[in-house]
Swiss-Prot record:
It comes from the Bacteria. InterPro entries: DhaK_dom (IPR004006), DhaL_dom (IPR004007), DhaL_dom_sf (IPR036117), Dihydroxyacetone_Kinase (IPR050861). Gene3D superfamilies: 1.25.40.340, Dihydroxyacetone kinase, domain 1 (3.40.50.10440), Dihydroxyacetone kinase, domain 2 (3.30.1180.20). One of its GO terms (cellular component) is cytosol. This is D-erythrulose kinase. Catalyzes the phosphorylation of D-erythrulose to D-erythrulose-4P. Involved in the degradation pathways of erythritol and D-threitol, that allow M.smegmatis to grow on these compounds as the sole carbon source. It comes from Mycolicibacterium smegmatis (strain ATCC 700084 / mc(2)155) (Mycobacterium smegmatis). It catalyses: D-erythrulose + ATP = D-erythrulose 4-phosphate + ADP + H(+). One of its GO terms (biological process) is carbohydrate utilization. The active site is at 217 (tele-hemiaminal-histidine intermediate). GO terms for molecular function: ATP binding; carbohydrate binding; carbohydrate kinase activity; glycerone kinase activity. Residues 329-360 are annotated as: Disordered.
């Protein structure tokens, strides 16, 4: 259990305060994460890694010479926002471009690609790459669907060494692709991990068993097996990884036996003795192995085995020196191109027109209703946090409730601030959407941000939107989710509640029903649709590898969307009664 914290909701922020103070020789804080304490030298590609926290030393612990130039730090097991990723990349960038790289998770892929788009619009050359090493998360031939777990480390290390050597951005991306194609990982869990403040783990493993094929975000394994001896575990891991080996003739391999947070180093060394013997018996030469904690999952008990097949180039980068807070190899040279950073900051946005200048009285009246709706949503989601987390943990990482609370709380504050500045309903929704995406992180954060900003763009800041405009705004929101999320109705996502909600609202509005009444009826339809997702199997996201396990449990994203729709309906009813 994660026992030491102040406010569980601020665990990541509090962790960063201590980390930065303890490692000021290596890193400084910037909005969204950390960068090297020394500026990036001219001509060097900046490598920015990242993801949710809870994996230390991944990701902030490997920022320094020979490794990453920056790390984007999200909330526990939650993708950082696009704004945070872009902020860290700007701070790390010198003049040769930026590679942003993460494990292959929907939220990271969405947010970091959005960050790349933003950086390119500012004239910064940027690329994104996702690691896909987890052999348990998708079958051979479907490698693009695989998660990134401890193989993140080998890919990040080689790409960073290539950048340190002076390769251009295309060359660094090529090395990342080669390292990823050569890397395979299989993990096991003996017990689940517990989020700060929670009184139970995200999953449990029956006594005397282990979960095979775990994820690093608290996702349980894809199957359960009886707990073997150390020798038996070594054989399971070696057979699993080598059984999926790439079509490569190389017999020289980099190997990581990675602890997940609670498994003792002494235990890992016992297992390593067996792993190394099995690999050598099969004719492999092990190059500079790593045994220890490199990519963890809070206090999860378990370990994983990673193998990267080495050609001459990858071996050079794997063996290259590095000097970071948590990982050191050889003697890495400090490249200083100027004064030591005191702090790097993201570019400040230019100020636009004052919000009050864009609105009229009707728009400001609508803004007051929108702000009240965000108040109500934040309270409803706070009450539902534990249940949403429980639903999400059945086949996912259990962070949905916490992410929705952080997002809705940030949206509530942003809406209130915009309202105080005289904003109309469109600007209030826009501000709330941006805040939700920035603070919630993860897949749901970026999707809710897109939903709210699309709705706000349609409603505008002047006049009182009629029922047809509101229905069109909801359709715009749905279309934004389709464009950004890559999911479709039936995939067991929030779309399975959003589409019925949208269609019912449109149908009733087309029959001249008031939007208030239509919204209530549509919310009821969305609630039933969310419940019906219990019968679906997820086809996208972290729950996909555990699709069968999720049957019988509704989708957390659909459930929370329906809850928000009902809450808005209640808020509208109260407001209407107040006017009467």
């Amino acid at each position: 259990m994660t026992k030491l914290f102040n406010d569980p909701a601020r665990f990541t922020e509090d962790m960063l305060v201590g980390f930065l103070d303890a490692n000021s020789r290596y890193v400084v804080g910037v909005p969204g994460g950390v960068v090297r304490a020394q500026t990036t030298r001219p001509g060097k590609v900046a490598v920015v890694i990242g993801g949710g926290s809870g994996h230390y030393p991944a990701f902030c612990g490997t920022v320094g010479p020979g490794f990453a130039d920056g790390a984007v730090v999200g909330n526990i097991f939650t993708s950082p926002s696009a704004e945070e990723a872009a902020s860290v990349a700007r701070a790390a960038h010198s003049d040769a471009g930026v590679l942003l790289t993460t494990g292959n998770y929907a939220g990271d892929v969405m947010n970091f690609n959005l960050a790349v788009d933003q950086l390119r619009s500012e004239g910064i050359e940027a690329q994104y790459f996702a690691v896909t090493d987890d052999v348990a998360s998708a079958e051979r031939g479907q490698e693009a669907k695989r998660r990134g777990i401890a193989g993140d480390f080998t890919v990040f290390k080689c790409a960073s060494a290539a950048a340190e050597e002076g390769l251009d951005l295309a060359g660094v991306v090529r090395v990342a692709e080669a390292a990823n194609a050569a890397t395979r990982t299989l993990g096991v869990a003996f017990d689940g991990c517990t989020l700060p403040g929670a009184d139970h783990p995200l999953f449990t493993v029956p006594e005397g068993h282990m979960g095979l094929g775990l994820g690093i975000h608290g996702e349980p394994g894809v199957s359960e097996e009886k707990m073997p001896t150390a020798a038996g575990l070594a054989a399971t891991l070696v057979d699993g990884v080598l059984g999926d080996r790439p079509d490569a003739p190389e017999k020289r391999i980099a190997v990581i036996l990675n602890g997940l947070g609670r498994t003792k180093y002494e235990e890992l060394f016992v297992v390593w003795g067996e792993v190394s013997r099995l690999l050598r018996d099969r004719g492999y030469t092990i190059v500079e192995p790593e045994v220890g904690e490199l990519v963890t999952s809070l206090d999860m008990a378990g370990c994983s085995l990673t193998v990267m097949w080495l050609d001459e180039e990858l071996e050079r980068y794997w063996a290259a020196p590095a000097d970071t807070p948590a990982y050191k190899k050889g003697a890495a040279q400090q490249h200083v191109s100027g004064e030591r950073r005191s702090e790097a900051t993201a570019r400040s946005a230019s100020s636009g027109p004052k919000l009050a200048e864009l609105s009229d009285e009707d728009g400001r009246a609508g803004a007051r209703l929108v702000a009240r709706a965000f108040d109500a949503m934040a309270e409803a989601l706070a009450d539902a946090e534990e249940e949403l987390g429980r639903i999400d943990a059945v086949a996912g990482d259990g962070d949905h409730g916490r992410g929705m609370v952080k997002g809705s709380s940030a949206a509530r504050e942003a809406a209130a601030s915009a309202l105080s500045e005289g904003a109309g309903q469109g600007s209030v929704l826009n501000a709330a959407g941006k805040a939700w995406a920035a603070k919630a992180g993860g897949t749901s954060g970026v999707l809710w941000g897109a939903l709210l900003t699309a709705l706000g763009a349609r409603l505008g800041d002047t006049g009182r939107p009629d029922s047809s405009v509101i229905a069109a705004g909801v359709r715009d929101a749905y279309d934004a989710l389709i464009r950004l999320g890559g999911a479709a109705p039936g995939d067991k996502t929030m779309l399975d509640a959003m589409l019925p909600f949208t269609e019912e609202l449109e149908r009733r509005v087309a029959q001249d029903e008031s939007w208030q009444s239509a919204w209530r009826a549509a919310a009821d339809v969305a609630t039933e649709a969310a419940r019906a997702t219990a019968d679906l199997r997820p086809k996208i996201g972290r729950a996909r590898p555990l699709a069968e396990r999720s049957v019988g449990t509704p989708d957390a994203g659909a459930t929370s969307l329906a809850l928000c729709a009902r809450t808005v309906a209640d808020c509208v009813t109260l407001s209407t009664q107040g006017e009467n």
